[in-house]
Amino acid sequence: MAEVRWIYDLTIFLYAASVLFYFNDFLQSNRKVNRLAFGLLVVVWALQTAFFVSQAVMKGYFPVITLFETLFFYSWVLVGLSLAIHYFFRIDLLVFLPNIIGFVVLVMSMFLPETPIEAVSSILTSELLLTHVTLAMFSYGAFSLSMIFSAMYLLQHKMLKGRRWSPLLRRLPSLDQLEGYAYRMNMLGVPMLLLSIVLGIIWGKMVLGEKFLLDSKVLLSELVLAIYSLWLYQRYRIRCRCADSSQWNVLAFLLLLINFLGFTTSTFHDWW
């Protein structure tokens, strides 16, 4: 780890600079600063990829097992998605906001252990479990973007109701676009989370038996999946497009975060 630690440290430094430049562009709408922020973000993603690959080579498994590894991978997913947003949508605010989350997550990973406990690492590095965690992280990335779209919807809705015209309002996509983007992200996230839970249950029954089924993290994951599935049902069948739907989406993501970071309540996620 020491050999590539400089990559991790440099990544955090450049990521902080990129977020600060994006914040400056958010306040002053400076195109030169925006291009600099985007260039730094590309470098950050490349460094994260290099660090991730080096960890996989050194550890001999796909590094998404410990909380350090999953937070790092989650941050990598968010950076990658924000770059895709820049390419397809060219909406700068949609690049800035996900990377606030991504940077905070990456900084959190600094304070966590980097290597799984040797006694259980052989069990934890099974392909089934690695696929389970990877799908979960990609679904979290999709839900993160969906939450941001819904939060922007609520902000714009409030500004329009209050007739508060500002430069920020002009930089936001329309309400219909924001709602549509949130819907598409949830359409991506729900199947991935479903597959992740199914694979996790299969792995749990093989390794832990029946005792894990009443674990708080398992139950809360199923609740999160049910909430997002119901949200999609209302959006598709009832055509519910309103501020209440966006509020529900934001609250669902908060529950997702509680489930993800509230690892101490779980009886078998103790290796994190």
Swiss-Prot record:
Which InterPro entries does this entry report, sorted A to Z?
Cyt_c_assembly, YpjD/HemX
Q: Which portions of this protein are annotated as coiled-coil regions?
A: none
Biological process (GO), any one = cytochrome complex assembly
A GO CC term attached to the entry: plasma membrane
Highest rank taxon of the organism: Bacteria
Q: Transmembrane ranges?
A: 7-27, 38-58, 65-85, 93-113, 135-155, 188-208, 212-232, 248-268
Which GO molecular function annotation, any one, does this entry have? heme binding
Q: What does this protein do?
A: Required for HemL synthesis.
Give the protein name, as stated in the record: Protein HemX
State which gene encodes it: hemX
